[in-house]
């Protein structure tokens, strides 16, 4: 990552609890928990506060300090790009072109940071009529930023726009439903229409508190209708990856975490939507590990101001060892670009010269879920995963270094705020699939029994 942030590098071991990317007195100082790894790229190691290394840990220390430093350095650059006027910018070396083109070109509008909205827009559909219903319902969130009952006037305008769009476009929406899902889709549209009437009554009763829950219910109907427009899996995965576990669709998992030493939080259950439409290899790999109970009993291994990370198994292995081969199972870097029908494999968007390309699954939402990898090996992802802990104002879409460099494959959609309460040593009691397992192709957990 040295080509992106021009730091001073020292031949020290990056196995530290804290790295100093720029200025330790800055409010955006990056803290990096220890990953028990040692970098083999000694000449490119950022200056760190190091600790004494256990000889038994040396083998595992080789590569994942590179991962933790790479991700944190990328996040540092993301902060710089997202907030170009930060007071500590004078302490940083200039970012090299063309990694960050003109921000005025990159930032075309406020980023979408709601994970469920991101998932709706990421579906492989092209139906303008349903989007015209979706958008004003989503705009209710912005309307509710107005204080007091005045917000309800804007909410009512949003609702009327959505109702009008549904009335005028209903036939086009129904025509866009997959034939096998048409009956269910029509039923959902009826519920959506009835729910809009209920929201209208809430507004007329001046019940501000009742708006947001009903809005979310309506948007869930919209999302379900849009999912019913997808007819099968929309493309062929490249031949070299077709025998891997693939998620051809979406799945939902629930992750239960035991939080230690926190009087306010004991157990957290996170609902995570895995998006196999845009990351079939990455999401399939993760779901296959979930079905193997790979993550059950594993601790949170990293938690700083930017990410929560886990997935490093005990022992010398740095990822999942496939029992059938007794070798590490790794997967390629997988990025779906906006406007493309098949993901890019094995290369970052920067390496391909796609500096202005937008990703279908951006690092916008608090709780964005992605695959960790070694900095200099794009196809080294295995089992280590991380969740983003930053608001999208600091990492706006298409203006942060993480987009196109790490494979996003899902979002936390329930209780994501509690990710900020997790810390190193908290235990993942279980990760269980609640839907979508039937979309998993080539599962190895069945072979393992």
Curated annotation (Swiss-Prot):
Protein name as it appears in the record: Peptidyl-prolyl cis-trans isomerase, chloroplastic
Question: Where in the cell?
Answer: Plastid, Chloroplast thylakoid lumen
Concerning InterPro entries, the annotation shows: Cyclophilin-like_dom_sf, Cyclophilin-type_PPIase_dom, CYP38_PsbQ-like, E_coli_cyclophilin_A-like, PsbQ-like_dom_sf
- Originating gene: TLP40
Q: Which SUPFAM superfamilies match?
A: Cyclophilin-like, Oxygen-evolving enhancer protein 3
Q: What does this protein do?
A: PPIases accelerate the folding of proteins. It catalyzes the cis-trans isomerization of proline imidic peptide bonds in oligopeptides. Has a regulatory effect on thylakoid protein phosphorylation.
GO MF terms here are: peptidyl-prolyl cis-trans isomerase activity
GO (cellular component) term, any one: chloroplast thylakoid lumen
This enzyme catalyses: [protein]-peptidylproline (omega=180) = [protein]-peptidylproline (omega=0)
In what way is its activity controlled? Does not bind cyclosporin A (CsA).
Listed A to Z, the keywords are: Chloroplast, Isomerase, Plastid, Rotamase, Thylakoid, Transit peptide
Positions the record marks as coiled coil are none
Electron transport as a keyword? no
| TM spans (from-to) | none
Q: Which organism is it from?
A: Spinacia oleracea (Spinach)
| PPIase cyclophilin-type domain mapped to chain residues | 257-449
Question: What Enzyme Commission number(s) appear in the record?
Answer: 5.2.1.8
Q: Which Pfam families match?
A: CYP38_PsbQ-like, Pro_isomerase
Is Membrane given among the entry's keywords? no
């Amino acid at each position: 990552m040295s080509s992106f942030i021009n730091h001073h590098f020292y031949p020290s071991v990056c196995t530290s609890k804290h790295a100093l990317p720029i200025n330790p007195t800055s409010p955006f100082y990056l803290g990096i928990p220890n990953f028990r790894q040692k970098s083999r790229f000694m000449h490119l190691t950022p200056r760190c506060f190091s600790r004494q290394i256990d000889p038994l840990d040396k083998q595992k220390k080789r590569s994942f300090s590179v991962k933790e430093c790479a991700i944190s350095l990328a996040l540092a650059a993301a902060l710089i790009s997202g907030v170009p006027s930060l007071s500590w910018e004078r302490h940083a070396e200039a970012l090299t072109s063309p990694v960050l083109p003109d921000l005025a070109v990159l930032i075309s509008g406020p980023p979408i940071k709601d994970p469920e909205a991101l998932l709706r827009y990421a579906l492989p559909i092209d139906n303008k009529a349903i989007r015209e219903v979706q958008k004003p319902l989503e705009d209710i969130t912005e309307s509710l930023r107005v204080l007091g009952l005045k917000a309800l006037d804007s909410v009512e305008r949003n609702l009327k726009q959505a109702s009008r769009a549904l009335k005028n476009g209903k036939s086009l929406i129904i025509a866009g439903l997959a034939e096998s899902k048409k009956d269910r889709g029509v039923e959902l549209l009826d519920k959506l229409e009835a729910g809009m009437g209920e929201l209208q009554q809430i507004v007329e009763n001046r019940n501000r508190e009742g708006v947001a829950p009903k809005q979310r219910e309506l948007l869930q109907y919209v999302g379900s209708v849009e999912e019913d427009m997808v007819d099968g899996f929309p493309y062929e995965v490249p031949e070299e990856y077709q025998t891997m576990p693939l998620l051809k669709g979406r799945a939902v998992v629930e992750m239960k975490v035991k939080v230690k030493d926190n009087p306010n939080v004991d157990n957290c259950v996170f609902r995570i939507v895995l998006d196999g439409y845009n990351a079939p290899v990455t999401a399939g790999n993760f779901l296959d590990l979930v079905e193997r109970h790979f993550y059950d009993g594993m601790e949170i291994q990293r938690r700083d101001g930017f990410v929560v990370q886990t997935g490093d198994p005990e022992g010398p292995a740095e990822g999942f060892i496939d029992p059938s081969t007794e070798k590490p199972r790794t997967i390629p870097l997988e990025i779906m670009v906006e406007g493309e029908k098949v993901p890019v494999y094995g290369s970052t968007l920067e390496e391909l010269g796609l500096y202005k390309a937008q990703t279908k699954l951006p690092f916008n939402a608090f709780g964005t879920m992605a695959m960790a990898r070694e900095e200099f090996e794009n196809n080294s992802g295995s089992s280590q995963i991380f969740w983003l802990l930053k608001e999208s104002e600091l990492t706006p879409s298409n203006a942060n270094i993480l987009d196109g460099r790490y494979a996003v494959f899902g979002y936390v959609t329930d209780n994501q705020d509690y990710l900020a309460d997790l810390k190193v040593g908290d235990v993942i009691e279980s990760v269980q699939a609640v839907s979508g397992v039937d979309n998993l192709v080539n599962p190895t957990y069945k072979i393992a029994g």
